Amino acid sequence: YARMIDTSLQNGQALLGSLTQMPGDGSKALLAQLDQHWNSYQSELKVLADTLKTQGYTDLQPVADLANHNQQLMALSAELYSKIQQESGRTVSALTQLSREQSLLMQSIAVDYASRSASVGGSFISSGGENSKSIDELANDFVQVMDKLEQAPQNTAETRQSLGAIKTKWRYIEKSLKNYNEKSVPFLVNKYSDRIIEGLEALSGQYAAKNI
């Protein structure tokens, strides 16, 4: 886990660092907020990772706090994404937008599953708050959106191949997600959720290139 955390932090920092030119004052302000939240999140995550390295386990509350912080980062990122479109006058095409939202949904599912796995024997707090959906409900939402993407007539041979590869990876963890109260397999879910997110990001790039 510690190695994966280090890699993820490096990737996150690189992506945030690539966001430089904003189209307006609103997006500039949101980017500054995002940068501040990221620095705080990064510090919390490093402390948690160091604790995991030295003790082999962590307390439940810091895990729950980090999951909530992750959700706040995602919400702020989505707000910045919308503001950039608004201020630039550019809108994202439908399938590009849907595939990007699907990537965020996969991340939410993975975060909730990891948090639940870490809270065995204790209370679990979803990253979406008290009124959020359960993991199996989120998994069902993921399947429905995948079906919608697959059925889109605008798909090309390339995007259909990408969708097929994503669906194959999804099958490895779908049962575990829908039966999350049974045997916990956090490493399996983390491994394949990362690959699914990578696949969805590649898919959104393919859609964006075709403006669909």
Can you name each region flagged by the protein language model?
Residues D59-L163:
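Extended amphipathic alpha-helical interaction segments
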Residues A64-L76, V189, I196, L200, ...:
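Charged, amphipathic alpha-helical scaffolding segments
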Residues N131-A139, L200-K210:
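Short secondary-structure transition/capping segments
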